[in-house]
Design a protein with these regions (language model features):
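Short, glycine/charged-enriched secondary-structure capping and boundary segments
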Residues: 76-77, 125-127, 145, 166
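NUDIX/MutT-family hydrolases
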Residues: 142-182, 186
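N-terminal leader/linker segments that precede catalytic domains of diphosphate-processing enzymes
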Residues: 1-75, 82-100, 104-112, 118-128, ...
Length: 209
């Protein structure tokens, strides 16, 4: 099991060189290689991988996005979105989006550090993932236009070997395309793949070092 004792260690570890692309690629869809050069017109975005304790065991907050026909429609993801002109930093973006989408105040979140950014071609987004810690179980106020529901996942269960699969996925926004992709199969209804899985993969590698 992964306990809250890991938080201070993670804070230190995120200041060291990160596993980066090598760790992310463990869960990258086989349809493409990640570009080595990020386009100049990439849109800056940020997400928050929020950890919180349940009986001293670290859980990870995920959300199920609404089915709205957008590139990430219906997917399991982290709270997050595009950088706004009112955001001084990308950390501010991640915290603002988390509050807007699930109702958790920025003042209650301890931002531990940043994971490795990654480019998502389908949405032209350069995503900056941040790791946060909430010292108590969250209370939610969901944005019904963006989030169907939340999923609380104990890290040690998500990282179990049997949770990793390779499958064929037809994205809701692109019904004519089938991707071969590695994924975390949380249960029969919840498949975590794409950028979210790649971010989780780096966190998993960090915690297993």
């Amino acid at each position: 099991m992964i306990s809250i004792d890991k938080i201070d260690w993670l804070r230190w570890r995120l200041l060291q060189p990160l596993p980066g692309l090598e760790a992310q690629n463990k869960m990258a869809a086989r349809v493409r290689e990640l570009p080595s050069v990020i386009p100049d017109n990439a849109k800056l975005s940020a997400v928050l991988a929020l950890l919180f304790p349940k009986k001293d065991i670290l859980n990870l907050l995920l959300i199920k996005r609404v089915d709205d026909g957008k590139p990430h429609s219906g997917q399991i993801s982290f709270p997050g979105g595009r950088k706004d002109t009112t955001d001084a930093t990308l950390t501010d973006t991640a915290l603002r989006e988390t509050y807007e989408e699930v109702g958790i105040s920025a003042t209650s979140i301890d931002v531990i550090g940043a994971l490795t950014s990654l480019y998502i071609p389908v949405s032209y987004s350069l995503v900056h993932p941040f790791l946060g810690f909430l010292p108590q179980e969250p209370k939610y106020m969901l944005s019904i236009n963006e989030v169907q529901y939340t999923i609380e996942v104990p890290l040690h269960e998500l990282f179990a070997p049997e949770k990793k699969i390779v499958t064929h996925i037809t994205p809701a926004a692109f019904p004519d395309i089938t991707l071969k992709a590695p994924a975390y199969k949380w249960d029969e209804e919840h498949l975590i793949w794409g950028a979210t899985a790649m971010i989780i993969s780096e966190l998993e590698v960090l915690l297993n070092i």
